[in-house]
Amino acid sequence: MRVIQTAGKRKTAVARATIREGKGRVRINHKPVEIIEPEIARFTIMEPLILAGEEIVSRVDIDVKVEGGGFMGQAEAARVAIARALVEWTNDMNLKEKFMKYDRTMLVGDSRRTEPHKPNRSTKGPRAKRQKSYR
């Protein structure tokens, strides 16, 4: 039995996806993807599944474990992990091209991270300054 593991990151969230032969079940942290709330996060996670098509998704089971970050960061990390898993499972360049054309970050990831706080007014953020008055 073939098993493939992939990972996806977004901000501080890390998702690890395991894909194997099955009946089309997709689970995020042991929950079926259909009951993930909020709805926007569910749709984000399902993007690669919809793009790949029913004939590919119905033949595999995907388990994703996500930790860290907020709900949207977790959803986008899961989306990256699922997309990478599907491309690796099918070895299909057309699918990879379809994902890249739709949204490049689905396979490549988003390298943006939060800027570290600077020492001036550390609790306020990286660029916060005291307000300056001229009169």
From Swiss-Prot:
One of its GO terms (cellular component) is cytosolic small ribosomal subunit. Residues 108-118 have a biased composition (Basic and acidic residues). InterPro entries: Ribosomal_Su5_D2-typ_SF (IPR020568), Ribosomal_uS9 (IPR000754), Ribosomal_uS9_archaeal (IPR019958), Ribosomal_uS9_CS (IPR020574), Ribsml_uS5_D2-typ_fold_subgr (IPR014721). Residues 119-135 have a biased composition (Basic residues). PROSITE patterns: RIBOSOMAL_S9. GO terms for biological process: maturation of SSU-rRNA from tricistronic rRNA transcript (SSU-rRNA, 5.8S rRNA, LSU-rRNA); translation. Residues 108-135 are annotated as: Disordered. Keywords: Ribonucleoprotein, Ribosomal protein. One of its GO terms (molecular function) is RNA binding. The keyword Thylakoid does not apply. Part of the 30S ribosomal subunit. HAMAP family: Ribosomal_uS9_A. Belongs to the universal ribosomal protein uS9 family. This is Small ribosomal subunit protein uS9. The gene is rps9.
